[in-house]
């Protein structure tokens, strides 16, 4: 019983020592992290520092002002239009969108023009399924089985397949019948040798 009590006392002392040492380390680590954050904030506030990829910012700009800095790759945005009206900025790669398309649904890059002012009123044009980029032109006269871009008329690895050729089919059938005839003659000769 006494050994159990001694063991529990030693175990509890070790636990408190470990907890105290870990809390000291964590408090030192927090202080060190806060110091580095303060140093970086002071560096950015004292000098006109910029992050990598953000490009140069003019000396007139103050870090504390409310000007929206643009992200890398977004290009220049005019401030006159931004002040006069709220314009939704385009993402890189989307290119210019004309003001006539501004209210319409924007198309993704690579999709090209899908509507025309002359054909918008026609219900036939609106009923045509638009093709995705890379699918090529599909004729409107008859329904074409949709295939993946680059496959052509046959799946890759199949080689050229000609149309129905009756001569080749007849030749294959003749060769198969000839092989069956040879097998039958061999079987007949073996049966005669065994007297069956």
From Swiss-Prot:
GO biological process: what's one of them? neuropeptide signaling pathway
Which residues are the propeptide, according to the record? Answer: 23-48, 58-68, 78-88, 98-105, 115-129, 139-146, 162-196
UniProt keyword annotation of Transferase present: no
Q: Does the keyword Magnesium apply?
A: no
**Modified-residue entries (Tryptophan amide), positions:** 54, 74, 94, 111, 135, 151, 158
Q: Write out the tissue specificity statement of the associated record.
A: Expressed in cerebral, pedal and visceral ganglia. TPGW-amide is found in pedal and cerebral ganglia and in shell adductor muscle (at protein level). RPGW-amide and KPGW-amide are found in pedal retractor muscle, ABRM and shell adductor muscle (at protein level).
- Which residues are the signal sequence here? 1-22
Highest taxon of the lineage? Eukaryota
What keywords appear on the UniProt entry? Amidation, Cleavage on pair of basic residues, Neuropeptide, Repeat, Signal
What function does the entry list? RPGW-amide, KPGW-amide and TPGW-amide tetrapeptides are involved in control of muscle contraction and may function as neurotransmitters. These peptides increase tension of the pedal retractor muscle and, in conjunction with FMRF-amide, increase peak tension of the anterior byssus retractor muscle (ABRM).
Query: Could you share any additional remarks the record makes about this protein?
Result: Tetrapeptides may be further processed to GW-amide, which is found in cerebral and pedal ganglia, by a dipeptidyl aminopeptidase.
For this entry, the protein name equals: APGW-amide-related neuropeptide
What organism does the record attribute this protein to? Mytilus edulis
Task: Supply the source organism's classification.
Answer: Eukaryota, Metazoa, Spiralia, Lophotrochozoa, Mollusca
